[in-house]
């Protein structure tokens, strides 16, 4: 049995719980920093700059067909920090939590708006990850929030990118996290955090 090894290169350091990386055509990487509350960009020199200070807990991100970045904002966490500030993990809903939302960000100017914060008057609790379909609309997971003695049951949504329609497609779903579409878009894939499963 042979072991394949590849060299890895560190592109940036000091990021505050990065997720949702997007490789851009110019070689830069756009990602969210959940603990920092930002949508950030790492240029080809490895320098990090803030595109937008979104607040809460920006989680997953995807570039839409209009060139805007669509961000799942989970509303924020309380954090446990260990190993001399070298390791941090989310543990509970933030004390300043005011709800989850889908945000639309102009990656050139940093201007942003809230596209959705509810579905038929049911609040979004903790939007987590997002994927666009060929029609230019998107699917996203809502993992929910964890509190000291209870946690939400999550859901999967489909929404129009122009802000005109959102549908709850599957609920309940325990801790839906990553989401993706097959190339022919006949299959939707969802990762479940708590159970360690892929559906």
Q: What do these predicted ranges mean?
A:
Residues 1-199:
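Sequence-structural signature of mature extracellular/luminal beta-sheet repeat domains
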């Amino acid at each position: 049995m042979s072991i394949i090894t590849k060299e890895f290169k560190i592109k940036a350091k000091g990021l505050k719980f990065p997720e949702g990386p997007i490789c851009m055509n110019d070689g830069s990487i756009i990602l969210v920093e959940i603990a920092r509350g930002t949508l950030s960009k790492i240029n080809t020199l490895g320098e990090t700059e803030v595109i937008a200070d979104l607040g809460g807990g920006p989680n997953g991100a995807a570039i839409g067909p209009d060139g805007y970045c669509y961000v799942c904002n989970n509303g924020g966490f309380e954090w446990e920090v260990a190993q001399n500030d070298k390791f941090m993990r989310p543990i509970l809903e933030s004390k300043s939590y005011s709800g989850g939302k889908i945000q639309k960000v102009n990656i050139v100017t940093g201007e942003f708006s809230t596209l959705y914060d509810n579905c038929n008057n049911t609040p979004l609790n903790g939007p987590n990850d997002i994927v666009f379909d060929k029609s230019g609309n998107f699917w996203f997971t809502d993992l929910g929030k964890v509190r000291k003695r209870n946690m939400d049951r999550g859901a999967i949504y489909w929404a129009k990118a122009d802000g005109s329609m959102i549908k709850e497609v599957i609920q309940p779903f325990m801790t839906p996290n990553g989401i993706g579409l097959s190339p022919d878009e006949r299959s939707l894939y969802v990762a479940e955090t708590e159970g360690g499963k892929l559906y």
